[in-house]
Amino acid sequence: MEIQLSIQCPTIRKEIGWEGKSEDVVRFEGGTIADVLKSIPTSNGETFYDRFIRDDHTMIANAVIWHNVVYFVQRDELDRKVNDGDKIVLLRRIPGGGG
């Protein structure tokens, strides 16, 4: 399966060797967001899943996954189905406040 992956955080792009690009086609086995994350290697030999998913299989607090640019994946929805050609955007929350 292939999806369009966009990574909007320069630090994450560097970790996976994407310096100079922010979007690419990713091929992977399986059919869930977790499978996509498991297919992305990082510079230290882990996968993106290893790096950003906690032992209870939820995302770390500052990771954000946007599916098809219409749905923000909740921390416990890594089994959300993806289809060939879908777009996944990976973001990091920026601390700050308003109000």
Predicted regions and their residues:
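Ubiquitin-like/PB1-type beta-grasp interaction modules and other compact soluble beta-rich domains
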Residues: 1-99
